[in-house]
Structures are given as C-alpha cells and as structure tokens.
C-alpha cells in the first residue's frame, strides 16, 4: 500500500470511527405512530401561563440576601402562601434547546441535538403547545420559532425581539425581559378592541408562554453572583407579579388560570452552561393557581443536600421533579393530551384535585408511555430475526394487559392509591423497556467498531515495523501470496452482508460491520511480519519485557486518568522533569537538561489551576503579551547572529508585523475588558482588529523563512496573537511555556539520539521546509521511539487539558470570545472556544519534528 493510499485509508477509517460514536451512543430515541392519550375528566384550569427564566439557578432564586430578605419577594410569597415548589432536575446538555424541549415536550433529546441549532430546526415531535387550542409566546427568536414551526396547524403564535438584542455587552440585558412583559400587556390591551382575539383568549386549553432571556444574558456577561444578575431576578419577579395581576383582572378572577415558573437550565459560577454541574442542572420550579396544591407544612424532609436550611424553607414541603415531568403536569392542568413522546411522570403532589382525577391522570400517563414502548418494541422486532430477538421480559404482552386491567379495576373500585402505585410501576418499566430497545444493538455495533479499531492499530504497527526495521526476511522468501485468505474474507463479508440484508438493517450498519473485513485481511497479509516480530520478542530477556510492558500500562493509565483528573498531568510532567536524571543527558547536556526540568515544573502548575475563575485577570494577559514581545526581541537577535540569516528585509517585515499584532492584541484585550466593564459595548475597532488578526494568523507563517526554528518561531507568534485575544487570565501564559518546552524537547531528542551514534544537530540547523525531506532516511526504529511517542501523545493531552477540560467546552469562560463578538451566536462562540483549545495543540504539532 502506497503512502497516499495509506493516508486516505486512515482518514476514511477514522471518519467511520468518529461517526459511529454518534450512531451508537447519541442516536435519537424518538418514535412515531402513537395514539394521543387524554385524561377523560374535566381539567381544573382553562389556561396555563408558563414563565421560563432562561439561565436561572435554583439557589439564585430561593436563597435570601445578606439582610435575610428574599431575592424575589413576590415569588417567595407565592411558594410560602399560594403554591407548590421544588427543584427541577435537568439533564445534559444543559442548553436552551434541549431544556425547552424537555419542559414543553417532556422528551430528552439526545446529546447531539445541541448541534441542530435553534430556530433553523423546529422540533420534530409533539409538545404541549401543539396539543393546545391556542398558544401565544413572547421572547427570544432562538427559542420560540422552533415550537411554532414544529406544530401542526397555525395555532402557535410568536412575538420575538431581534436577534441583535441578545448582546452580552449591552448596557442592560434585563431590557429583554422588560420587552416581553410590555408586549404581553399591550397584547391583552389590544384584545379588548379585537373581538376575534378576545374570544380566542377566553377559550379553553390556552397556553401563554413568556420566555425571559435577560437572566441568562446577564449571567453570561457578568456571572451569576453579579449585581446585574441579581437585579435581573428582581425585575423578573416584579414583571411576573404585574402579569399575574393583569391576567387575573382580564379574566375576572375566575380561578381558572394555572401558573408555572421554571428555568431551562442553570449556570456555572463563571457564567457558562452545557455540562452536568449541580449549578447547571438544578433549576427552580414554582406552580400556583388553578389545580395546583397549596403549600404543605412539614416537620422534616429527606434530602441529602443542605439547600432547605440555606434557603430557610425547612418547614415547606419541597417536591423535586425531573424536567420532563413538567410537560405532563401542564397537560394535566389544562386537559390536553399528553405529548406523544413525553417520558415524564406526572408529579401528583403538585395537583390539587380529587383522588379520582389523579388516578385517571396517572393511568393516562402510563398508557401514553406504554404506547411508545410498544412502538419501539415492534420496530426492533421487525428488524431482528425471530430466533435472535430477545424481548424485554418484565413487560411482555401478557404483562402489559395485566397491568392495564388491574389499574382500571382499581380505579373502578375507587382504590385510587393502589391504581396510582401500579401506574407508576408500569411507567418505570416502560421507560426501562424504551432504554432497553434503544440500546438493543449497542453491544453488537460497539464490538464491530472495537474489532476494526484493534485491527487498524495492529496494521499501522505492522507497517511501521516493516518500514523502519529489518524484519523483512520472510517477505523476501515468500514472494507468492496465497489467495486462500482473500476468498475466506470475501466469504465472511458476504455472510455479514446477507445477515444485515435479511434484517433490513440501516446502511450504516453495513459500514460498521463490514469494516473489520478489509482491515483484518490487510493484517493477515502481513502475517510474516508478525511471525518474525514474535520470534525476535521471544529472544529478549523476560525481565526486560515484563518491565517494559508494565511501564507502558502505567503510562496508558496515566493518560486515561488525565481525562477525569487534570492533576494527573502534573504528576506526569514532574516525572518528565526527572527523566534526564536517569539517562546520560544530565551529564552530556547540563544546560539543556536544566531548562527542560524547569519548564516541565512550570508547565506542571497549570493543570493544578482552576479551569476558569470567577473574575477575569487581564493583567496576566498583558504580562503574557509583554513576555512574548520580550522573547521575540531576544529570538530575532539570536537569529541575526546565526549562520542562516534572513533572505532579506521581507523576512524581518513578517516578524515585525507579527510582533505588532501581539502588541495590538494585548491592547485590544485590555481595552475590550474595560469597555464592557463600563457597559459601553464592544468597540468596533477592537472587533475589526480581532477578526483581522484571526484571519492573518494562518497565512503569515507561510511568508516567514522556511528554516526550521525560524518557521516555528513565526508560527508561535501568529498563534499567540490569536490566543491572547481569546484569553482572560493565567491561560495566556500556557502556550508560551508549552512552546518553550517543545523547543527544548527538540534539543533533548538530539542528545538522546547521540546514544545510538546518530546526531541530527547539523541537519536540524539547516532543515528547510521548502525542500521535501524523507525522514525515514535518518535512522531505523529504536525502542526509545516508544518513549518518544508517549511523550508526543502526553503533550497533546496536556495541550488540550492544560487550562481547561476539552470534554466540556463550558469549562471555558465565555468572556474569552468578547473581543470578537458579544451578540449571542452559539456556533460562532463555540467555534472560537474550540479554536482557543486547539491553538495550543497546533503549537504542539508544529514543533514535533523528531
């Protein structure tokens, strides 16, 4: 296999590996074809008002101020005197689209749904809004249209402000909520002169949805503990009070209006969300009005947290729910069918109604969830051979009938508590069954991918050994290749394809299941290399082999632990710092070794630092910029004294422009921070400079000298200019230390190669990227290359996790992108944060030359 073909095959294989993750673990559990289920008894409310305070944390609403006064006096009075309250537990990802879908449709979208966008991709399943007679909604253009466009018919109406209004640098983001409250008031005032609208508003099964984005915007811009965030909560509290008063007056205090206030997600202390920290997943829930229970006083409550004591609510019953449970609660209050795809369980404790109504509602809930289970089971049964199909035994067809008959009998006999208990059991079993059938093929597909992964890794190792060692004797002897393995693998592929065909499997299953066939055929073709390698390994001392194997396992475990505990990287870097001591390099290159040790120790500090802080530390960014300029001056002076001088003034112009970009980026960061702090918005000049710097960062290094160290120096300057613009604190120093360590690593590897009688010092000094160089001509593979490869992978992981957790982009401060934009744009902001994380890795890759 030639090099181009090998590279293309590698890209294709890894693309399949990447796609398989989403297909196996993040596929949507959505099913269609269910029958709507509705409680047969009259509902307690004619209309429902849903307030969603976007980004509102539970503790921010319920906790008292320093002077023991409530943060939201009106809502506090409601939960103490008129309604029920608790915590709504959200799921990952804690983003606006999945959160609102769970609230309004009772359905948890898969994790990949966060990439579907907002208004561009309407929800593709049923919701409370869709089942209502009329729904009027006010708020963000990112949320409302997706429910309106996803609804059947034209009964969901939206009123949105402009997308440009969602500006994190605005003077007062609370104006977004004021806009909503004002437009709701004017809407109801206008209905008095519009008989058609007035009649529609007075019908049954009406929903009013107020999406309040100001709290989320202020949280991103100023943090949840800021004055702006808390003041926004107070304004929302006042606005809710005004809306409730206005509605009660409009409807003549008929007692037929139910109110629910909650949030789609919370927010971290540094103003981001998306992951599973309690500050993001714990959101408030307050319900009051028609059909809702009054506060229940209790003497003790069984909760492991200390929230009740902190919030001084120990005597009022706290009723926690899952976020998806709110959808069936809303449906029950106004008597609409439960959303078809809802997986929520009706929280009966919130209902103030007869036991008969509660039992009937819970029975309806159970049938609605069971309908999904039956559809999911039939789908899986159709695509699985009968003798291979394994049903979900706790909920067989006979068990389903028994559950439903028994529950209905209990209701007829007025044994409502027994009926409710049985329905809850049925719901839990149906949900487990849904999960069972949704993950039915996960093991099968996972094994196929694992076999492919092991096969590809084995093949790559064999190619490296074959290319860079002398294990080619067998290949020279056995010139004739047997056709037996080819026919065997072709037959295996045909069997797999036929098996998938008769099961009507999706086309992706063919890719995942057939991929191991050509990969392992390629491995079998290199059987002679495996035999020669095994013979050589058996000749090695057993003690050395076992010791080397244990070190490899320890190194791999260290890398795995670093994904969960960043401090593990510190341990590895400190071990790296002591590496020269156990080799000859401490004797033959003391100066280089000392610098290596110091830089390893400095770099080891970063994983111990918090991923982000509550407040930006702009002085550290300025220090990083000035340090970069100082190092640049010394480097230019060093290059000018070297034998390989510049081709002309053009080379110097590139470096001077890059240094100017560093200085300008440092100024822009400081200027932008001060401007936003004074609520003056993002200066246009700063925004233009930031985007121009980003655009030029990838092009300027191509204009620099092509000699190794001079090109690497240019790459560092370009990446640092962009990284400074994306920094808010100590992380600005990270790429400087990392790149310095990488440059010293090159020197260290030169010294290490001298142990084998090889020296690249002179060759690296004149190494030129302008000329094609075959690196394989330098030397054969040595055991030390495994250590070198481990260093390479470890430094890549360090580049990703050194200043944050790349597994969760929300561990990075959203203020990092404010030099580029402050108007809400999730994909642009997320892309810039990913660029920030990747920049350090680009530095790492660009300096991996040995």
Each model region followed by its residue ranges:
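Active-site-proximal alpha/beta segments of enzymes that process anionic O-linked groups
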Residues: 5-20, 27, 44-50, 57-206, ...
